[in-house]
Structure formats: C-alpha cells, structure tokens
Amino acid sequence: MYKRQVTWQKGDVVYDGNASAWGTDCFWAPEVYERDGRYYLFFSANWRHNPNGDLETFRIGVAVADSPSGPFSDLYDRPVFDPGYPVIDANVLWDDDGRVYLYYSRCCYKHPVESELSVWARDKGLFDEIEESWVYGVEMKPDFSGVIGEPVVLLTPPQSASDPQTGWESRSVTAGEVNRRWTEGSYAFKENGTYYMMYSANFYGGQHYAV
C-alpha cells in the first residue's frame, strides 16, 4: 500500500488458498480489476485435480473482494475453464462493445515445438528438444464463469531463423541457459481503435528476460 506514492507500508495477505480451494500452491501472476464497485483478482495456481500426476497443473481462477486490499474469496470453486494444458498470466480486456476477453500464456511444460531453432540446438548438441509457451486469447463470459468459444493462438516465439525477432526472443536457448522459449506475461490494450499487446520473452530467471 502507498500514501501519495512516497510513503509505503506493508499490507496484509489479500488472498490465501485453503484446504478446500481448487488451487493448491504456486499462486502466480495476480491482476486486479475494478468493475461496478467490486474488485476481481485473476491469478494462476496449481489445480487440485491432477489424475495424471503432472508436475504442473496451472489453471486460472478469479476471486472477489469489496476492497483492493482484500480479503479476496474465490468467486467459484473451480478454475475459470480447463483448456487441457497448464496456463498462467491472466490478463483481461473489456472491449468497447462490452465483450470481455481473457489472455493467458500456455506453459512450456510438455509442449515441445519443432522449429528451425530446435533443429539448430540439436545440431549444436545443446538440447534435444525445445519447449515453448504461447499466448492465447478467448472471449470470457461476463460473470467470469467460463469462456465462449475456443482459445486462439495470438503469439508464439518465432519459428524461422530469418525472423528478425528470433535473435532476442531465443537467447535463453542460444546462450545454453535452458531448453525453453517463453511468450508470456501478456498485457493487451486498445488505443485509437488499434489493439496492442505487450509480452515478455526468454527465461524469467535468466539475464535475457525482456519485454
């Protein structure tokens, strides 16, 4: 919390999972939005439902509070939806026509992608495969109880070595850091009728992470 953006004071925990919550751990990437006087917290967490024993079961949930400082409570006892793969980094856009869109990042986990870079990495003896995270978008129901239609892929790491974006978006691989390429942390906004999306690439724990 801050006062006049100069003096800061530590706030309390605003959301805490419990034994009956759908999310178990690794609560991740919160974003809070005010709508009609209430505050909605979108976040990622590992889903309790894990019949295959996966290491990552991230899904996106939403909690609600009457104050931006919480406490927040789950709006539903389940994730917003289940795309069939782990997802993080929820971002929400309300369009001028009232429709609501959810953007998220598919995790790299169990998502190997064959590309010119993966062939290069294999030839160099760096990595056998390259896993990637991609940004998707999908329309969301106004009450956040689910989605409308199927998610659409909006952003991926460059697949061609000749793509001018490949250099900076692939440094985690070319530097031998890790066998993954990220497109994550998306933020969508609209300005003068045009839609823009910011995002982050490269290993979030490495020196090449960038926007």
Predicted regions and their residues:
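Carbohydrate-active catalytic/glycan-binding domains of CAZyme proteins
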Residues: 3-211
